[in-house]
Swiss-Prot record:
This is Hemerythrin subunit alpha. InterPro entries: Haemerythrin, Haemerythrin_Fe_BS, Hemerythrin, Hemerythrin-like, Hemerythrin-like_sf, Hemerythrin_metal-bd. PROSITE patterns: HEMERYTHRINS. Fe cation 2 binds at E57, H72, H76, H105, D110. Signal peptide: none annotated. One of its GO terms (molecular function) is iron ion binding. Pfam families: Hemerythrin. Belongs to the hemerythrin family. Octamer composed of two types of chains: alpha and beta. Fe cation 1 binds at H24, H53, E57, D110. Hemerythrin is a respiratory protein in blood cells of certain marine worms. The oxygen-binding site in each chain contains two iron atoms. PANTHER family: BACTERIOHEMERYTHRIN.
Length: 117
């Protein structure tokens, strides 16, 4: 999936769950802000929205007994592990990785739970 320019959520990433789509917007906004204002505070804020979203999304999956929950959780944990190594100012290659990961993760992984949560 191509990284949108400017980097922002759009309907191509809609999951059909309003609360998840709203949180996905915050992920896009967090990475965009980090690319524009590459500070320690912005990095911490970006990490925080990812942690919060993954917790919320995984909670919904668990509640619905989503069959791919453990696999999906592992993918989230792998991303957070990589993000945990980022230090401000974050290298552009790492920010780009985060953007590419997000635009690929939503259609490849999150779309699998459409109609199942």
């Amino acid at each position: 999936v191509k990284v949108p320019a400017p980097f922002a959520w759009n309907e191509d990433f809609a999951t059909s769950y309003k609360f998840i789509d709203l949180e996905h917007r915050t992920l896009f906004n967090g990475l965009f802000a980090l690319s524009e204002f590459n500070t320690r505070d912005q990095l911490l804020a970006c990490k925080e929205v990812f942690v919060m979203h993954f917790r919320d999304e995984q909670g919904q999956m668990e509640k619905a007994n989503y069959e791919h929950f453990e696999e999906h959780k592992g993918i989230h944990e792998g991303f957070l592990e990589k993000m945990g190594h980022w230090k401000a100012p974050v290298a552009q290659k790492d920010i780009r990785f985060g953007m590419e990961w997000l635009v690929n993760h939503i259609p490849a992984e999150d779309f699998k739970y459409k109609g199942k949560l």
